[in-house]
Amino acid sequence: MNKYELVLIFKPELSEEDRNTVFSRIQQVIDENGKLEEVHDWGKRKLAYEINYIKEGYYYIVNFDLDPQFVKEIERRCRLFDQIIRYMVVRVDEQ
């Protein structure tokens, strides 16, 4: 298993309950196939640049261990939700 970091940016008009519902669907893949390390809710922040006329969003940073074959499934689920403006999964080097 490798260590990964997932950055999620949710639309600014979403309630905390809606964000948690969407995140739980992504977390399900991690829990079934790996281990969730940390979840950081950075709150509402201004975006570095406008995305589809949206200027701010809710940031989540998620650290987890997962087999590489399941990363595609996480990316697929992130693409399915309109509530997610942007996402990025990166492998973290172990030191």
Swiss-Prot record:
One of its GO terms (molecular function) is small ribosomal subunit rRNA binding. One of its GO terms (cellular component) is cytoplasm. Coiled coil: none annotated. SUPFAM superfamilies: Ribosomal protein S6. GO terms for biological process: translation. Keywords: Ribonucleoprotein, Ribosomal protein, RNA-binding, rRNA-binding. It comes from the Bacteria. PANTHER family: MITOCHONDRIAL 28S RIBOSOMAL PROTEIN S6 (PTHR21011), SMALL RIBOSOMAL SUBUNIT PROTEIN BS6M (PTHR21011:SF1). HAMAP family: Ribosomal_bS6 (MF_00360). Binds together with bS18 to 16S ribosomal RNA. Belongs to the bacterial ribosomal protein bS6 family. This is Small ribosomal subunit protein bS6. It comes from Finegoldia magna (strain ATCC 29328 / DSM 20472 / WAL 2508) (Peptostreptococcus magnus). The gene is rpsF.
